[in-house]
């Protein structure tokens, strides 16, 4: 997933972050349509309503995430975004373990914000918007998954999201006028759609339906650290010590919550 994000960051010089986000959404919708081929029932309003809201929530999460990435390092953005899953888990229980996890997450975010707040206020706010959208993604994704046709509904949801957010495609036009190869942009859109959206979100649907929250949380706990590693290797983004401690604190908060479930 975050390898795709690293590719997206390299595109920011040619295409706006919002345009890259739309390319990712549209690319994922196209790939999923070709592979999944939803049946007629998937397009009925009774199913399309929830699927569409889910797709739009996912699109909002991606757009806010990419806008934040344009202002903050990858590992930092992901760590801030993880407030969403932590909040969802904390809302479901009031144990001491949950309080400890929330405390660790707050400390982690405070450490990260202390590094970036002075110069990247908007980046922090956008990452927190992405966190709120991620919380919505988890709650809606669970409802979609338990209906038994999660991959089909994921596909139709992304089609709805790609259509509704299609005005963002206009932000790609300047890149084409500046001489960017259209076919290269299409290829990158498909690559982003597969690496960052179609595959990981389809796997989320399988996981949300088949495993418990504890195991899912353990897997999620690896992602802030993974994002920091990808940012370091692919983008040469070296985190400050305080920032690294904040990322580890957020990952630790998720592990603490996982141990109580």
What is each PLM-predicted segment?
Residues 1-22, 53-56, 60-64, 107-110, ...:
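Glycine-/small-residue-enriched transmembrane alpha-helix faces in small-molecule transporters
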Residues 14-60, 83-88, 133-137, 155-173, ...:
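Transmembrane alpha-helices of multi-pass small-molecule transport proteins
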Residues 14-22, 43-48, 114-136, 170-191, ...:
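Juxtamembrane helix-entry segments on the extracytoplasmic side of multipass membrane proteins
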Residues 19-27, 58, 65-96, 130, ...:
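Specific alpha-helical transmembrane segments that line the substrate/conduction pathway
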Residues 23, 78-80, 140-162, 197-233:
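Helix-helix packing/entry segments at the starts of transmembrane helices
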Residues 29-53, 94-100, 118-119, 148, ...:
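Membrane-interface interhelical linkers
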Residues 46-55, 91-107, 123-128, 148-158, ...:
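Cytoplasmic-side transmembrane-helix entry/capping segments in multi-pass membrane proteins
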Residues 83, 97-115, 132, 221, ...:
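Hydrophobic transmembrane alpha-helices of multi-pass small-molecule transport proteins
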């Amino acid at each position: 997933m975050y390898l795709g994000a690293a590719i997206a960051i390299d595109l920011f010089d040619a295409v706006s972050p919002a345009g890259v986000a739309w390319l990712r959404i549209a690319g994922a919708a196209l790939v999923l349509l070709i592979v999944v081929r939803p049946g007629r029932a998937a397009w009925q309003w009774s199913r399309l309503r929830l699927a569409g809201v889910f797709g739009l929530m996912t699109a909002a999460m991606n757009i806010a995430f990419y806008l934040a990435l344009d202002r903050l390092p990858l590992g930092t953005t992901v760590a801030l975004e993880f407030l969403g899953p932590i909040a969802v888990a904390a809302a479901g229980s009031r144990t001491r373990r949950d309080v400890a996890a929330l405390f660790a997450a707050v400390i982690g975010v405070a450490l990260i914000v202390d590094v970036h707040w002075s110069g990247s206020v908007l980046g922090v706010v956008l990452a927190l918007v992405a966190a709120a959208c991620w919380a919505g993604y988890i709650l809606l994704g669970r409802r979609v998954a338990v209906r038994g046709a999660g991959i089909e509904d994921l596909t139709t949801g992304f089609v709805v999201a790609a259509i509704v957010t299609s005005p963002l495609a206009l932000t790609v036009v300047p890149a084409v006028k500046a001489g960017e190869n259209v076919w290269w942009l299409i290829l990158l859109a498909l690559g982003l759609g597969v690496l960052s959206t179609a595959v990981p979100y389809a796997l989320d649907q399988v996981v949300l339906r088949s495993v418990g929250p504890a195991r899912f949380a353990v897997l999620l706990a690896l992602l802030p650290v993974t994002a920091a590693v990808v940012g370091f290797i692919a983008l040469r983004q070296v985190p400050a010590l305080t920032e690294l401690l904040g990322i580890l604190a957020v990952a630790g908060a998720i592990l603490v919550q996982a141990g109580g479930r």
